[in-house]
Amino acid sequence: MTKLVIHLVSDSSVQTAKYAANSAIAQFTSVKPKLYHWPMIRNLELLNEVLSKIEYKRGIVLYTIADQELRKALTKFCYELKIPCISVIGKIIKEMSVFSGIEIEKEQNYNYKFDKTYFDTLNAIDYAIRHDDGQMLNELSEADIILIGPSRTSKTPTSVFLAYNGLKAANIPYVYNCPFPDFIEKDIDQLVVGLVINPNRLIEIREARLNLLQINENKSYTDFNIVQKECLEVRKICDQRNWPVIDVSTRSIEETAALIMRIYYNKKNKYNK
C-alpha cells in the first residue's frame, strides 16, 4: 500500500475538504491515506502554526479558505516546498465566473447542501440533542467529544455548535455533592473537555436564569462558595486525568468551540515532534 499524507485546511470545519479527499481516495485501491485536519484557520498566527506542521509532515494540501491573504500565504508556502496545494472549489468558482461572465466576489461565502457532510451534520445535531445534560450515558462511546462542567457554563450551545461542524458532542453537568458518572474512572478514547467560568460571572448567569423562570427558592444554585467549589472540582477531575480545561468567562460560544476543535484535531493528528 502506498502511504499518502493529506492536509485538510479550512476556515470552518474541514468537512467539505474531507468529503472531497475521501471521494478522490476512493478511486485508488492501493492507497493508505493519512488525513490531518486543520479547522477554523482564520488568521495568520493560526495558519503559521499549521504551516510548520505541513512542513514536518509533507503531503498534499486541500483547502477551503475565503480570506485572500490566507490563501496566498498558504499557496506560496506550498509552492516553495514543492507540494500540491489545491483549492477544493477554486476551479469550480473560476469556471462558473468565466461561463457566466460574473466576477468573483472578494470574500466568498461557501454553502454546501445535501451531500454526505450535510447528513453527517444532521446526525451530529441529533446526537447532541439526545445526549444533552447527561442523558443516555450508555451511548458515550459514540461521541467524538464529551463536555463536563457546572450548570450554565455553555455546554449545550457549545455541543450544538460542534455538531454543526460534524462532531458528535455529549455534555454532562457537574453538580456539587452529587455523584459524577462512573465513566470518568474508565479509559476512554473520546476527548473530554472541562468547561469552567469565573464564579461571580456564573452567579450572574444563574440569577438571570432563575429570574426568567421566576424561581426564588434555590439558594445553593447561586451560593458563591458552592459555585466556586463546583468549578474547582471540575478542574480537579480534569487535571487528575490530563483532560483539557477551558475557561469560558470571556469566550464566545464560537471561540470555545473553535478551541475544542483544535484540541480534538491535534489529538487526532497525533504529531510527535
UniProtKB/Swiss-Prot annotation:
Example of a GO MF term: ADP binding
Pfam families per the UniProt record, alphabetical: Kinase-PPPase
Catalytic activity field: N(tele)-phospho-L-histidyl/L-threonyl-[pyruvate, phosphate dikinase] + ADP = N(tele)-phospho-L-histidyl/O-phospho-L-threonyl-[pyruvate, phosphate dikinase] + AMP + H(+); N(tele)-phospho-L-histidyl/O-phospho-L-threonyl-[pyruvate, phosphate dikinase] + phosphate + H(+) = N(tele)-phospho-L-histidyl/L-threonyl-[pyruvate, phosphate dikinase] + diphosphate
Keywords: Kinase, Nucleotide-binding, Serine/threonine-protein kinase, Transferase
Enzyme class: transferase
E.C. designation(s): 2.7.11.32, 2.7.4.27
Positions bound to ADP: G149, P150, S151, R152, T153, S154, K155, T156
Gene3D superfamilies reported in the protein's UniProt record: P-loop containing nucleotide triphosphate hydrolases (3.40.50.300)
Family the UniProt entry places it in: Belongs to the pyruvate, phosphate/water dikinase regulatory protein family. PDRP subfamily.
Function per UniProt: Bifunctional serine/threonine kinase and phosphorylase involved in the regulation of the pyruvate, phosphate dikinase (PPDK) by catalyzing its phosphorylation/dephosphorylation.
Protein name (database record): Putative pyruvate, phosphate dikinase regulatory protein
